[in-house]
């Protein structure tokens, strides 16, 4: 038995030396004694490939490539030790989750942290570390007791941490003892079984690719030294460390220490170790710059390289995306030149997670095949989401978020139906559930979903055919979504043990045909050449079944709550990862600096070389802090590297990466992060500049215009990328700047290729202006017809912004409805409740002035109770919170009813019409217009309230409109067409008064009544009567009144002098109207009536002529865009030349009236 220690710097040919020696043995004796090639997990596939591609070998059965775990499986299969069930890390984490829940009450430090996400994984990592470093629970207890008596607080806190870890560690071992085995146990078992392994006893063992070893691995290597026929260790070091371990600042500290420990162990075992030192760095012999870098990287002071650097390039970029885009272009350039294959290229980062998403996106766009080394979480796979969301449905009482997370995995979709149609229907169902607040037993009830697109508080309409069709579709979806989940819910409720719970989940997946659906997806991915995706579908099902099996194996007969069951399943699912191997041989390798192993790499891109990232700052996010680890190490406990040791080893990892390529090295760094914050270059960049003072840094540019023509050609990676950059260049050209002829050639090529339609559509966006052309006559007629029936508010919308009108009434776009009570719903309730109360008073032959406070409360309560089931999908009946809101609304309506009663007592006006309809079946006809373009238009709607009074001058009519906000009448808004309702209602009432009331009426005014429950503020305490008076004042009606003393007194019979508490008017001592009264002459009302008719005529003609321009108004600081639903759709942007507000000048009422009179005179009779 002999031990050979092979050493050499990076690139000296150690791995090639071993491979050649193995090849020679295979050539000499193809079926000779076993050859074991022991390498890290990340290197097994690569070494197997290197051996298998040797052209003159008849086979490699004799030689096997192993990692430690694969060797353990092989040996234990032959010698025994595999009779206990194996628990994966997933199973361990699930078991730990249960132990944490059971014992967290005993914790001294981690009681609060135990409920946080990731805690179980951190504990599992810590306990794994204990095992790998051969520290049993008793050792942890001894350290705990040793620190617990310390006079220092930090050490006592460490003792408390060890106390909590000891509880979990000891309980875990109790659960595993003599029943299960975990991955870390296999190395211990391997070390025990090697003496009995026949294939080891005669084997030649080669160990390569490792930088250091855990105590567990050292125990295995010790047994291999004893029992293997020969063993060769290969370690990257500048010399054999036979007598002393290197000092802490030595570049090869990590590997040198491993060399020394192994060498000393070989001597202890009585072996005669020999050393082979490879002096020459063969990897870089044709590239002196790389040879210089490898040789002098760690020498101080730096030895400058005399000359240009063809094989080394330093690059900087504005951000990470630009960095990766530049690297992708460089890779394409290298491939086009024929110098490299994709498999010759590696992209290495200190932490590839920082770049993973960007690399995936950019390399996919650039059509660069790649493989990211490392395990990827299964969290985003549909099967994992199906299980998690289904359990969330059961836990959360069928909340819609969880339901649609589940449904959108598409694993519950029934077979044989087109997925596109189902997706569209699911979107409709989701909209329905959001709008109707569907949750809980509304899913599981046998009662079908009820769908109403149109609803009214005042009338019951029959369902339309479209509503019935939609309702049937919704219930059909419910019919296949609910049963499997509901069956699972029932089974879990009945389940008494973990086995029964796990079986319920398995049955759920089987009944939903999940295995068959995954197999179909796997086959489709395979047929489409998506090999990695195909393997994922295969692995995820196996992983879930193994998870359930382990769960049952560990706790099958135990009883646990559903909450703990879900927590443990969640913990298990979070730990599942895909074990991927490269799906193809020719692809770019993407890896982590510390974990990835490379061989035969010709070109390396080291990315993200920024300060704080490289060298990496040690992470201090475990359950033990770096100070804890330092203390334990000083007191004899051997654990993984401390933060200080990790920092010392960073230089070695950087050295290994920089020296990994044989021909070309690129080092790049961004100067800003994704948020624009400055990033500094790493000290590695400074070091490279010291070693290569003549090297020039290249700036990776996102846009090509700053480069010469030849460099711009690099941006033509493929058609898609070329088109993207061409669009940018043509955008520059449209701003009157010259662009390279490269882009005109690209333009000509794309415009003349067979598939040019796509390119034409993309490039047409360059000439886009956010300006809408008016519809032509035919389109307008098709959209609106030749007869328009609309409302006053529709005309106000058009006058506010024609495009908003087009979106809402032309395209009929609607926002997604939500199950919540909003201001329009409350306003609708107020209107309908007051109408019901008025109707009830009419039935009882009572007047408003006859009402008592008790009657107001009773009538209000009855009205709200009748309306609640009809309002917004029964929202007021949906929860205790909304029940409280309903009571508040009843209180407001009772308060308002009382005020209306008081108003009636002090008024000579009485209601003559409530919710008075005009047009349709209403008592008043619509307002009709014949438009100049031959179309017709009629306006229909309802008037909240019309009051009448007899005066010495005849019949007077006034309009009262109920508003849930405090509002007055601004004549500027009337003039610009933004507030037309009140005067329209007055015009209709006056115009048709003879037919309606039997006599001609005159206008008395228009008033807004604010429906609310006012809050009274006072500087001194007030009595109840004073409070009621103040409340009464808060209901003063604002608007515009007839400037006639008799009319004003009819509206407030209590008014003698001063301001009225009922209307916005007042009288002086001499009986004349106060100057601050909101009044106009009767003729002014007629001028206003004629103006609104002209406004409607103009709006109708513009609508039917196809006006759809984006022209929102701006009046003072008010614009319709503030609350517009279509803002993101119209994309109005004031910074664009073609987008500007239509500025409306605010004017005093007197100025507006004068202007209207002049316009009236100019137009003549309307």
Curated annotation (Swiss-Prot):
Q: Which residues are involved in binding [4Fe-4S] cluster?
A: 801, 1121, 1124, 1130
Task: Pinpoint the UvrD-like helicase ATP-binding domain residues.
Answer: 1-285
Using the record's annotation, list all stretches that form the UvrD-like helicase C-terminal domain.
Answer: 279-586
Q: Where does ATP bind?
A: 8-15
Name of the top EC class for this enzyme: hydrolase
- Give the highest taxon in the source lineage: Bacteria
Which InterPro entries is this protein grouped with? ADDB_N (IPR049035), DNA_helicase_suAddB (IPR014140), DNA_helicase_UvrD-like_C (IPR014017), P-loop_NTPase (IPR027417), PDDEXK-like_dom_sf (IPR011604), PDDEXK_AddAB-type (IPR038726)
Question: What GO biological process terms does the UniProt entry carry, in alphabetical order?
Answer: double-strand break repair via homologous recombination
- Enumerate the cofactors the protein uses: Mg(2+); [4Fe-4S] cluster
EC numbers: 3.1.-.-
Q: How many cofactor units bind, and how?
A: Binds 1 [4Fe-4S] cluster.
PROSITE patterns in UniProt: UVRD_HELICASE_ATP_BIND, UVRD_HELICASE_CTER
Q: Tell me which UniProt keywords the record has, alphabetically.
A: 4Fe-4S, ATP-binding, DNA damage, DNA repair, DNA-binding, Exonuclease, Helicase, Hydrolase, Iron, Iron-sulfur, Metal-binding, Nuclease, Nucleotide-binding
The UniProt GO MF terms for this protein read: 4 iron, 4 sulfur cluster binding; 5'-3' exonuclease activity; ATP binding; double-stranded DNA binding; helicase activity; metal ion binding
**Subunit structure, as described in the record:** Heterodimer of AddA and AddB.
For this chain, the family text in UniProt reads:
Belongs to the helicase family. AddB/RexB type 1 subfamily.
- What's in the misc comment field? Despite having conserved helicase domains, this subunit does not have helicase activity.
Tell me, what does this protein do in biology? Answer: The heterodimer acts as both an ATP-dependent DNA helicase and an ATP-dependent, dual-direction single-stranded exonuclease. Recognizes the chi site generating a DNA molecule suitable for the initiation of homologous recombination. The AddB subunit has 5' -> 3' nuclease activity but not helicase activity.
Query: What is the designated name of this protein?
Result: ATP-dependent helicase/deoxyribonuclease subunit B
């Amino acid at each position: 038995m002999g031990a050979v220690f092979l050493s050499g710097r990076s690139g000296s040919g150690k791995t090639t030396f071993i491979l050649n020696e193995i090849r020679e043995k295979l050539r000499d004796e193809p079926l000779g004694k076993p050859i074991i090639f022991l390498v890290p997990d990340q290197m097994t596939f690569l070494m197997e490939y290197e051996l298998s591609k040797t052209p003159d070998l008849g086979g490699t059965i004799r030689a096997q490539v192993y990692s430690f775990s694969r060797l353990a499986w092989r040996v234990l299969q032959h010698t025994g030790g595999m009779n206990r069930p194996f628990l994966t890390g997933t199973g361990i984490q699930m078991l730990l989750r249960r132990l944490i829940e059971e014992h967290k009450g005993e914790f001294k430090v981690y009681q609060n942290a135990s409920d946080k996400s990731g805690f179980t994984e951190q504990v599992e990592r810590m306990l794994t570390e204990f095992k790998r470093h051969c520290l049993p629970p008793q050792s942890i207890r001894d350290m705990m007791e040793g620190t617990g008596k310390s006079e220092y607080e930090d050490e006592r806190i460490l003792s408390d941490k060890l106390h909590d870890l000891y509880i979990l560690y000891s309980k875990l071992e109790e659960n595993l003892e003599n029943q299960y085995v975990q991955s870390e146990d296999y190395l211990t078992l391997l070390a025990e079984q090697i003496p009995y392994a026949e294939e080891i006893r005669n084997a030649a063992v080669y160990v390569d690719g490792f930088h250091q070893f855990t105590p567990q691995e050292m125990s295995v290597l010790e047994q291999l030294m004893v029992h293997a026929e020969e063993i060769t260790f290969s370690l990257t070091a500048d010399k054999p460390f036979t007598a002393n371990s290197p000092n802490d600042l030595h570049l090869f500290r990590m590997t040198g220490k491993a060399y020394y420990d192994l060498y000393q162990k070989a001597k202890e075992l009585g072996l005669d170790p020999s050393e082979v030192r490879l002096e020459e760095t063969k990897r870089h012999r044709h590239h002196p710059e790389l040879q210089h870098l490898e040789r002098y990287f760690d020498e101080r002071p730096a030895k400058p390289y005399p000359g240009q650097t063809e094989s080394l390039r330093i690059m900087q970029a504005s951000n990470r995306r630009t960095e990766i885009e530049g690297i992708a272009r460089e890779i394409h350039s290298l491939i086009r030149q024929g110098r490299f294959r994709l498999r010759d290229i590696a992209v290495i980062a200190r932490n590839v997670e920082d770049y993973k998403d960007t690399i995936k996106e950019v390399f996919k766009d650039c059509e660069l095949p790649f493989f990211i080394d490392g395990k990827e979480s299964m969290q985003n796979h549909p099967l994992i989401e199906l299980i998690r969301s289904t359990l969330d449905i059961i836990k959360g009482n069928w909340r819609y978020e969880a339901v649609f997370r589940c449904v959108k995995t598409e694993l519950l979709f029934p077979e044989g139906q087109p997925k596109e149609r189902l997706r569209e229907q699911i979107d409709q169902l989701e909209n329905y559930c959001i709008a109707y607040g569907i949750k809980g037993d509304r899913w599981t009830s046998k009662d079908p979903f009820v769908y109403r697109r149109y609803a009214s508080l005042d009338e019951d309409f029959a369902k339309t055919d479209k509503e019935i069709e939609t309702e049937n579709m919704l219930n059909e979806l419910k019919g296949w979504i609910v049963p499997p989940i509901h069956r699972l819910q029932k089974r879990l409720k009945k389940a008494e043990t973990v086995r029964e719970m796990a079986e319920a989940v398995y049955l759920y997946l089987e009944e939903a045909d999940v295995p068959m659906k995954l197999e179909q997806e796997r086959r489709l991915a395979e047929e489409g050449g998506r090999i990695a995706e195909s393997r994922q579908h295969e692995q995820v099902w196996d992983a879930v079944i193994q998870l359930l099996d382990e769960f049952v194996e560990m706790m099958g007969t135990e009883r646990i709550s559903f909450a703990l069951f879900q927590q443990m399943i969640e913990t298990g699912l979070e730990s599942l990862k895909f074990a991927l191997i490269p799906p193809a041989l020719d692809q770019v390798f993407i890896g982590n600096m510390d974990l990835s192993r490379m061989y035969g790499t010709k070109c390396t891109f080291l990315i993200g070389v920024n300060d704080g990232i490289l060298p990496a700052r040690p992470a201090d996010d475990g359950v033990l802090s770096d100070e804890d680890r330092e203390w334990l190490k000083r007191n004899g406990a051997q654990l993984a590297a401390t933060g200080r040791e990790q920092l010392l080893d960073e230089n070695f990892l950087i050295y290994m990466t920089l020296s990994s390529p044989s021909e070309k090295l690129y080092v790049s760094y961004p100067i800003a992060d994704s948020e624009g914050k400055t990033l500094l270059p790493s000290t590695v960049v400074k070091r490279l500049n010291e070693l290569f003072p003549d090297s020039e840094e290249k700036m990776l540019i996102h846009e090509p215009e700053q480069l010469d023509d030849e460099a711009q050609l690099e941006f033509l990676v493929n058609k898609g990328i070329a088109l993207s950059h061409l669009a940018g260049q043509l955008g520059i050209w449209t701003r009157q700047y010259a662009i390279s002829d490269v882009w005109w050639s690209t333009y000509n090529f794309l415009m003349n290729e067979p598939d040019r339609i796509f390119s034409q559509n993309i490039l047409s966006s360059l000439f886009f202006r956010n300006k809408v052309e008016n519809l032509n006559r035919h389109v307008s007629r098709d959209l609106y017809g030749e007869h328009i029936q609309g409302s006053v508010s529709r005309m106000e919308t058009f006058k506010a912004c024609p495009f908003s009108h087009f979106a809402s009434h032309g395209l009929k776009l609607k926002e997604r409805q939500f199950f919540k009570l909003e201001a329009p719903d409350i306003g609708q309730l107020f209107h309908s409740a007051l109408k019901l109360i008025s109707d009830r008073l009419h039935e009882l032959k009572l007047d408003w002035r006859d009402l008592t406070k008790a009657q107001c409360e009773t009538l209000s309560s009855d009205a709200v109770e009748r309306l609640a089931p009809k309002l917004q999908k029964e929202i007021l009946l949906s929860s205790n919170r909304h029940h409280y809101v309903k009571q508040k609304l009843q209180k407001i309506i009772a308060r308002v009813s009382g005020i209306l009663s008081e108003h009636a007592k002090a008024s000579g006006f009485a209601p003559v019409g409530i919710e008075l309809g005009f047009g349709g079946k209403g008592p008043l006809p619509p307002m009709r217009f014949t438009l100049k373009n031959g179309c017709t238009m009629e306006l229909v709607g309802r008037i909240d309230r019309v009051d009448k009074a007899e005066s010495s001058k005849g019949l007077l009519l006034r309009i009262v409109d109920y508003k849930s906000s405090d509002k007055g009448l601004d004549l500027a808004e009337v003039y610009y067409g933004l507030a037309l309702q009140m005067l329209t209602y007055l015009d209709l009432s006056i115009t048709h008064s003879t037919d309606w009331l039997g006599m001609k009426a005159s206008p008395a005014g228009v008033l807004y009544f604010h429906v609310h429950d006012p809050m009274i503020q006072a500087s001194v305490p007030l009595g109840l009567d004073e409070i009621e008076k103040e409340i009464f004042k808060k209901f003063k009606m604002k608007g515009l009144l007839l400037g006639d003393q008799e009319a004003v007194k009819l509206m407030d019979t209590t008014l003698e002098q001063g301001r009225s508490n009922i209307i916005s008017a007042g009288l002086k001592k001499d009986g004349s109207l106060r100057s601050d009264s909101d009044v106009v002459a009767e003729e002014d009302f007629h001028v206003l009536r004629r103006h609104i008719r002209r406004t409607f005529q103009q709006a109708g003609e513009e609508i039917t002529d196809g006006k759809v321009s984006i022209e929102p108004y701006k009046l003072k600081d008010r614009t319709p865009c503030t609350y517009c639903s279509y803002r993101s759709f119209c994309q109005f942007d004031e910074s664009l030349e073609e987008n500007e507000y239509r500025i409306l000048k605010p004017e005093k009422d007197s100025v507006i009236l004068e202007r209207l009179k002049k316009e009236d005179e100019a137009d003549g009779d309307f």
